[in-house]
Amino acid sequence: PNLDEKVNLIKLPGLDLFQTFSFKDRLKIFIKKKNKRAIDFYEFFSTFFGGFPEMRTFGERAKEFLDINNQFDIVIDNQSISYGLLKIQKKFPLLEVIHHPITKDYKFELQLNRSFMYRLSRHRWYSFLKMQKKVAPQLKKIVTPSFNSRKDIASDFSVNKENINVINNGLDIDIFIPYNEIKRNPTKLITTASADVALKGLDYSLKSLESLTDDFPEISLTVIGKLKKGGHTSRLIDELGIKDKVFFKTDLTKEEIAKEYASSSIAIVSSLYEGFGYPVIEAMSCEIPLIATNASSIPELVGDYARLIPPKNTNELSNSIRSILNNYSHYKKIAVKGRQHIIDNFNWLKITEEYEDIISKTINDFHKC
């Protein structure tokens, strides 16, 4: 991570087996590891059989580190929800940050492909959910970035809602700015999505684009994300015949992303689920008219400053794009108000003050016990 020079980074390295997907290379990494322990064997064999063990192994290594380093005032964990946290929680004030329950990712991935082997592979990959469902209900202090995630964590992980505090994520509002000097392309659409990730609903944006090509011959879609060669999204683009109208851009800085918004006319968030939709507030901060699904956390983020549509509805998306392109000045005025909404509610000063309060409360409550 990129850290301030005043922040000390303590590394707790595992085998790092996901640096490669070659079995031979992974085996070499495992064999070269000196003084192997049970946790290393678990990490290797779980990965070998298609699992993702890193959350569990990190939690165990963090517990071991904290057993001999007790100088910390509080421990903040980001979504590992691992067994090790239950032991850490007995010795330290613990604040667990959960973006959303990964049960949602699992659910939507199963909907993407119904073949037996695919479903079996997903079952193995998400096998860590069994651990998380056991650990989450026992955590005393949880922070999540939206009320929708709070509801889903309570439901899917059987957590008492009183233990879950909502603090929105913040945004660099001085980076995601309108860039009014950049001329907008009147028929350029933009979205942020990881190709082949079912949750992001990119399929519906692509199908909508195809349906609009007759009415708007110059229309195009820029996707902030990476296209997987030969993957589902790549095949769909070929099937729809829109290869010359879809452009993927990766490895952009925040400033470059903001400038992409500035040169576009409509931002689209066609997600099926968002624990906290960063693309939503990034687009709004850049004063671009926004179309987003009314799914999960999105309505509570956008307020009255975006055009909301049902998820998986290509016709509604196409009609919304037409409406905005045909009445752009009206929707641009809404977008200007939308930026002020983001400034008021998602600036880092507000968010950090809320985190300071919950951190102080977590420490005080621990020492009262």
PLM feature segments, named:
Residues 182-200, 206-209:
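Conserved donor-binding/catalytic core segment of Leloir-type glycosyltransferases
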Residues 232-255:
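Nucleotide-activated donor-binding/catalytic signature segment of Leloir-type glycosyltransferases, i.e.
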Residues 289-292:
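Short hydrophobic beta-strand element within catalytic cores of glycosyltransferases
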Residues 23-49, 89-133:
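Acceptor-binding helix/loop patch of EC 2.4 sugar-transfer enzymes
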Residues 272:
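Aromatic "clamp/platform" in nucleotide-sugar-dependent glycosyltransferases that forms part
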Residues 148, 170:
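Carbohydrate-associated surface elements
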Residues 259-264:
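Short alpha-helical donor nucleotide-sugar binding micro-motif in glycosyltransferases
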Residues 307-314, 323-328:
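Conserved acidic donor-binding segment of nucleotide-sugar-dependent glycosyltransferases
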